[in-house]
Amino acid sequence: MESGDLKIFQAVAREGSITKAAQMLNYVQSNVTARVHNLEEDLNIRLFHRTNRGMKLTAAGENLLQYADQVLSLLDQAEKSTRMSRQPKGPLRIGSLETMAVTHLPEHAASFLRRFPEVDLSVNTADTHHLIQQVLDHKVDGAFVYGPVEHAAVRQLHVSHDELVLISSREGTAEDMLQQPMLFFGAGCSHRDRVKRLLEEAGIHNQKIIEFGTLEAIIKGVSAGMGTALLPKSAVDGSEHRTNVWIHQLPPSYQDLEIVFIYRKDFFITSAFQTFLDEINEMKR
């Protein structure tokens, strides 16, 4: 006896008609007739009286209907309960580069929370070095950082590419602009090593560094003429101060920025985290 047979039996019993039951279930009438007949054969007992007025339950049919109602109700509850258990919920701690947090992440995070309101999402911004350490220390579940990341305990997923550009408040060559003071995030900024190599190649030493706490502060500082900065092009394009700065391309070997999402290999993947990984795959499209 299968649950599908019980469902058909219940429908015929409630409707009192093969035709009406078939319409309600959106089944072919001959299929409903055959399934009822097979059920009676399996149980070796008549469940319905067939009359010109339709189908009427026998005593055995009345008895089976009570159990069919209970079984189908339990199956429905089990299905709903299982579906609910798969619904992502609970805390989800994500680390992110500030440039990612103000460009690509908000749109996807908003979409994610609209679909999964039971997830308690928190986003912590920092530089790549500190974010990797936060992942290793279990302070965040995963993080968007600049890659590639080479660490035995970490798994990484490619998210996107960006272009590192030099910005200034006036027109000129990149070589000329490198002579200006450089505006950076605090110590640990992921681009400092690149800048150091770039300046060494250009023969520039003892460059003045001015540190800022936020992306917008850096871009605003550049637009005000305080100096130059190296930033992802997407972050500059999305800034309200974009029209006040010039963008200069860097040599090809300095341009590429790969953004990856990292998490510990031994991290227990919750339903909320797995769903977020699925959202990351959407970011790639």
UniProtKB/Swiss-Prot annotation:
Induction record: Maximally expressed at stationary phase.
Location (main, coarse): cytoplasm
GO MF, one example: transcription cis-regulatory region binding
InterPro entries to which the protein is assigned, alphabetical: LysR_subst-bd, Tscrpt_reg_HTH_LysR, WH-like_DNA-bd_sf, WH_DNA-bd_sf
Entries under PROSITE patterns matching the protein: HTH_LYSR (PS50931)
Segments traversing the membrane: none
Sorted UniProt keywords: Cell cycle, Cell division, Cytoplasm, DNA-binding, Septation, Transcription, Transcription regulation
GO biological process, one term: division septum assembly
Role played: Regulates expression of the cell division protein ftsW, and is essential for cell viability during stationary phase.
Protein name as annotated: HTH-type transcriptional regulator YofA
Organism of derivation: Bacillus subtilis (strain 168)
